[in-house]
Amino acid sequence: MREYLLPTRVVDGNKIENADTLLRSKGLYATINYNAEEWKSYLKMEGVGSFIILDFGKEMNGGIRMITNGIKYDSCKLRIRFGESLGEVSVNIKEKNANNVHGPRDFETLVCSYADVTMGKTGFRFVRIDLLEDRFVYFKNIFCENRILSKKPIYTYQGKDERIAKIFEVAKRTVDLCASEGYVWDGVKRDRLLWAGDLAPEIMALNSIYGRLPVVERSLDLAKKLAPIPKFMNGIYTYSMWWIIILADYYKEFNCEKYIKKQLSYLVELLDLLDGMVDENGELNREIRYLVDWPTKGSVDELVGVRAIFLMAMNGAVELLNAFGLSTEKAMKIREKILKQPLLAQEKKQVIALKYFATGELTDAEYNKLTEGGVKGFSTFMSYYVLSAIASRDEKLAIELMKEYYGAMLDRGATTFWEDFHIEWLEGSGRIDEIDPTKKDLHGDYGDHCYVGFRHSLCHGWSAGVVKFIKEHCHN
């Protein structure tokens, strides 16, 4: 669905008049105005150094629709910046890793008199517009053009806990934005791409909220199409394993025989390929790229996590092959090889949780590691698995930890959930919708790996796996 939304506030500006007039609609069309009195109901920007920062209130996916009136000399040059946080919209390219990756979010453009023009296609909440010439320009309105999934849900949280209700609402918005344009993306700023492994928690959320959706099947089919055997999905062999896990869960949930039958020949070929990723002694291939999640990257537990994902995938493959009367010999053989090496996680909570999902086992020592330090060590990608593993022993504690972890993002201004978040980032930092020079920038001063600073996505679909946890454990 495409919708047009007004800004909710004017954050800042210079050399501007009538800025608050942008907060009310004067129509989605351009008009010629010869009455100077009417110009008082339009934003006026005049001269080099004139700028305005608008807040649209929530994370959006799209751009801005600018409706202009009179402009001195009929056209003028503007600089437009989009930001998921107020910090991001206020800096220059390269500053704290601000960039134009996956979509331009900081650029110069030309606007003309009496025009109705849309600019940008990215993820944002804030927009800054700078006038770059010694001219004036009148804006009748500046709308956000937002694209968001609009389907009737089969599930919404109806309980009385306001914190859980807000977490559900924000997680739903996160995945609604990421699934709004035909495929399920990682994020709406970045990555505007389909990553097969990252689909797992996103599809959990979509299945929980809406049931069976065409956008999910299109995305699974595209992942397969882009990785003909002998390629792995996204060049990462664990991501091909996640495709199997998703497929097995999808069949269990919807009993969609016709759809699954179309995947079986690829699945059989993929098993032959995956067989080469583990030798007869259970040692994993380390030459081809693998990933558990970013906080696990390079840790002592990373390969244990790969092994757990491998086992989950083979469990799923056996279930699918059995259901359709096909040989399970290859999947069983791979599973036997994987189990020749112990699944012993030393420190990472997400790896302990994956091991629990792979084997159904959780020792007292592992449970103690899961709960030690509260939400320290949580990751948004693996939130469903970690919270569910804790809930297998103590559901009430798991719910409280969910409220603490996701609630902390809400308390700092989140309107969608983030690519990553560590509770330690809260110390000495501010909100994403404010700039406080006495505090660290929660967006620009943190991050890791490929999401350092303002490259960090504040609307990342993999964070929405918490929806399934809420549906399963936070009963109405």
Region spans (language model):
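Short, charged/polar micro-motifs that form catalytic or ligand-binding hotspots
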Residues: 56, 117, 192, 206, ...
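Alpha-helical structural elements
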Residues: 24, 29, 34-37, 102, ...
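A subset of signal/propeptide-processing and intrinsically disordered low-complexity segments
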Residues: 92-94, 193, 455
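Second-shell loop/turn segments in exported
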Residues: 153-160, 189, 204-205, 300
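Extracellular/oxidizing-compartment recognition motifs
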Residues: 1-184, 197, 214-220, 258, ...
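Glycine/proline-enriched, intrinsically flexible loops and inter-domain linkers
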Residues: 188-190, 194
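Active-site core of glycosidic bond-cleaving carbohydrate-active enzymes
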Residues: 195-201, 205-476
